């Protein structure tokens, strides 16, 4: 009988705590769900400063300019003072004006991932640019990720057989490492990459992800047309 009374008393003491915890979680969820609105205060080329009255978005968050077509995404790169962020535009800033409304998406830039993305070309914000329609992928992943831990990396030294005899003989590639190809214009860097993509797919059954960072549009277009 005494044990039952003690248990009932403990339950009564626990109920206010659970109610307070539930209200705390609800408040946090409501705060996270709230979309922060800001306005553009400066445009300097691809650099756009956005002012927020409250809920300053964290670094690397994606912002979107309201009522703009095509959509323009801004990535937060720096905090300036208490209520202003400096962002980098992921596309052209022509036509932007001071006072234009900006919305915080609440997360970093995310792109589609999965088997549906194989053979597709997308820009940095995950929009398809190969004129083959939308990518029907239900999964997305942020473009920023932590580097894998050293304990998760393989320490075995193994040669990646590329199928290119001059590479495998004179400068073999180590599997799992990084490789740099340096050369002038027109010496065959892109051709070598296309051979690697082809041989990795056919000889090893693997997948290749080609990211054109700072590349000219013509080179990416030529590579795509050659590979299909």
Curated annotation (Swiss-Prot):
ATP binds at residues 183-190. The keyword Transit peptide applies. GO terms for molecular function: ATP binding; proton-transporting ATP synthase activity, rotational mechanism. It catalyses: ATP + H2O + 4 H(+)(in) = ADP + phosphate + 5 H(+)(out). Residues 1-31 form a transit peptide. It is an enzyme of class 7 (translocase). It is found in: Mitochondrion; Mitochondrion inner membrane. Keywords: ATP synthesis, ATP-binding, CF(1), Hydrogen ion transport, Ion transport, Membrane, Mitochondrion, Mitochondrion inner membrane, Nucleotide-binding, Transit peptide, Translocase, Transport. InterPro entries: ATPase_alpha/beta_chains (IPR050053), ATPase_F1/V1/A1_a/bsu_N (IPR004100), ATPase_F1/V1/A1_a/bsu_N_sf (IPR036121), ATPase_F1/V1/A1_a/bsu_nucl-bd (IPR000194), P-loop_NTPase (IPR027417). Its main location: mitochondrion. Its EC number is 7.1.2.2. Gene3D superfamilies: 2.40.10.170, P-loop containing nucleotide triphosphate hydrolases. One of its GO terms (biological process) is proton motive force-driven mitochondrial ATP synthesis. GO terms for cellular component: mitochondrial inner membrane; proton-transporting ATP synthase complex. It holds the Pfam family ATP-synt_ab. SUPFAM superfamilies: N-terminal domain of alpha and beta subunits of F1 ATP synthase, P-loop containing nucleoside triphosphate hydrolases. Mitochondrial membrane ATP synthase (F(1)F(0) ATP synthase or Complex V) produces ATP from ADP in the presence of a proton gradient across the membrane which is generated by electron transport complexes of the respiratory chain. F-type ATPases consist of two structural domains, F(1) - containing the extramembraneous catalytic core, and F(0) - containing the membrane proton channel, linked together by a central stalk and a peripheral stalk. During catalysis, ATP synthesis in the catalytic domain of F(1) is coupled via a rotary mechanism of the central stalk subunits to proton translocation. F-type ATPases have 2 components, CF(1) - the catalytic core - and CF(0) - the membrane proton channel. CF(1) has five subunits: alpha(3), beta(3), gamma(1), delta(1), epsilon(1). CF(0) has three main subunits: a, b and c. PANTHER family: ATP SYNTHASE (PTHR15184), ATP SYNTHASE SUBUNIT BETA, MITOCHONDRIAL (PTHR15184:SF71). Belongs to the ATPase alpha/beta chains family. This is ATP synthase subunit beta, mitochondrial. It comes from Drosophila virilis.
């Amino acid at each position: 009988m005494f044990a039952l009374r003690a248990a009932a008393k403990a339950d009564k003491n626990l109920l206010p705590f659970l109610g307070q915890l539930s209200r705390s979680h609800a408040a946090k969820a409501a705060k996270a769900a709230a979309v922060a609105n800001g306005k553009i205060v400066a445009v300097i080329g691809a650099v756009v400063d956005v002012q927020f009255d409250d809920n300053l978005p964290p670094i690397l968050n994606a912002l979107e300019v309201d009522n703009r077509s095509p959509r323009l995404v801004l990535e937060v790169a720096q905090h300036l003072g208490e209520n202003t962020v400096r962002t980098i535009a992921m596309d052209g800033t022509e036509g932007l004006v001071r006072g234009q409304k900006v919305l915080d998406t609440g997360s970093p830039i995310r792109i589609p991932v999965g088997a549906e993305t194989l053979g597709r070309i997308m820009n940095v914000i995950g929009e398809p640019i190969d004129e083959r329609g939308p990518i029907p992928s239900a999964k997305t992943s942020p473009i920023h990720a932590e580097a894998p831990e050293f304990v998760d990396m393989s320490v075995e030294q193994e040669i990646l057989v590329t199928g290119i005899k001059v590479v495998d003989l004179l400068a073999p590639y180590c599997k799992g490492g990084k490789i740099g190809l340096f050369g002038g214009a027109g010496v065959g860097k892109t051709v070598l990459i296309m051979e690697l993509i082809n041989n990795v797919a056919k000889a090893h059954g693997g997948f290749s992800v080609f990211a054109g960072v700072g590349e000219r549009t013509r080179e990416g277009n030529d590579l795509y047309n050659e590979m299909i």
